[in-house]
Amino acid sequence: MNIKGSPWKGSLLLLLVSNLLLCQNVAPLPICPGGAARCQVTLRDLFDRAVVLSHYIHNLSSEMFSEFDKRYTHGRGFITRAINSCHTSSLPTPEDKEQAQQMNQKDFLSLIVSILRSWNEPLYHLVTEVRGMEEAPEAILSKAVEIEEQTKRLLEGMELIVSQVHPETKENEIYPVWTGLPSLQMADEESRLSAYYNLLHCLRRDSHKIDNYLKLLKCRIIHNNNC
């Protein structure tokens, strides 16, 4: 197929470069380099960049969870306590692809934005608390810092997408509130590590959901479900 001069060329090159950066664990390009107020990026490119960025965040979240699991939780059985205890569990998220495909497009976009907003505070405190740990593992801290920064960028990108797809939509500030800071500051090491494990487990879970949801939405909105 000759892509010279076709509208696919820019998107294809962007995805190729972004995939190379992901393989090298380098942050993807900004969703809108000029900032939201002066954004001239097309809807197709906004989705391309959001999908690449969400996948990058999920990869980092998975790596950070694995690092923490290996270093701190061997044989402690934290996983049994982490099930269904995420602060975003109250959100009505689709459980499989079929449910996701049946979800109203506007509600789907709003759901992704709500999940991203609900992670602003826990990610900020995660970075702050890990920095304060004795002998804070650099591999975990650096990933936490990067995830916090890139999640803000992804949220900005999603708000731009919503403004293009549904310009009549008013900003929705309703999202689940995280109340787990006291648990991260407990004096008892077992309880504190369990709280960290739960938070990282939930982050990995939610970043995976967003990654999948964005791919489905891109297929629906940009390619008219022809994927």
UniProtKB/Swiss-Prot annotation:
Gene Ontology CC: extracellular space
At which residues is glycosylation annotated?
Answer: 59
Q: Which GO terms describe its biological process?
A: cell surface receptor signaling pathway; female pregnancy; lactation; mammary gland development; positive regulation of lactation; positive regulation of receptor signaling pathway via JAK-STAT; response to nutrient levels
Which cysteine pairs are covalently linked by disulfides here? 32-39, 86-202, 219-227
PTM Phosphoserine: list the residues.
54, 62, 118
Enumerate the SUPFAM superfamilies for this protein: 4-helical cytokines (SSF47266)
- What start and end residues bound the annotated signal peptide? 1-28
What biological function has been recorded for the protein in this entry?
A: Prolactin acts primarily on the mammary gland by promoting lactation.
Family that this chain belongs to: Belongs to the somatotropin/prolactin family.
Give the quaternary structure. Answer: Interacts with PRLR.
Name listed for the protein in its UniProt record: Prolactin
Q: What organism does this protein naturally occur in?
A: Macaca mulatta (Rhesus macaque)
Q: What is the lineage of its organism?
A: Eukaryota, Metazoa, Chordata, Craniata, Vertebrata
